[in-house]
């Protein structure tokens, strides 16, 4: 897919506390809290991260510990590991990486795929084929930022974490640059 990097969007303040990021997402999606687990799930992150060859951002892990996989507005699928199925997570990430490499990455963009340093690691997608990825740059996963590959070929960066990105996309704080509008209904998957 031919694309070009448009530019970056930067949040007014990057949320680094996972609980604060999740609270922002729950405010942006009032129906999300209806699907919150009654207790924080104990996921074996060592298995997940070893299979991926990298640690993952704490906001994503915190979201997965409190919520199962869900869809926003029947548009954006937020796939999350399930307790007891951590050994299967690598398959989903690898499948998304294969699609990214085969159909999306253009040499001119200068955006490599994971596991290359600073490589892209997909974490979500829309029903129209938009890809939401981490750019794995920085000393720790907490410094990673979101890269969006729009179905129309436009690529852009959001200088915050995945959970803050979802919150600001849903509450219209950020400009959706090529992403379609969707309602805020939350559906467990």
For the regions a protein language model found, what residue spans apply to each?
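Short polybasic amphipathic segments
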Residues: 142-149
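Low-complexity, Gly/Ser/Thr/Pro-rich intrinsically disordered linker/tail segments
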Residues: 177, 181-185
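Short, surface-exposed beta-strand/loop micro-motifs that present aromatic residues
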Residues: 130-137
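Short, solvent-exposed loop/turn segments that connect beta-strands within catalytic domains
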Residues: 86, 138-142
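A surface-exposed partner-binding patch
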Residues: 1-128, 184-187
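Compact, glycine/acidic-enriched structural inserts
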Residues: 154-176
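Intrinsic disorder/low-complexity segments enriched in polar/charged and small flexible residues
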Residues: 47, 68, 106, 125, ...
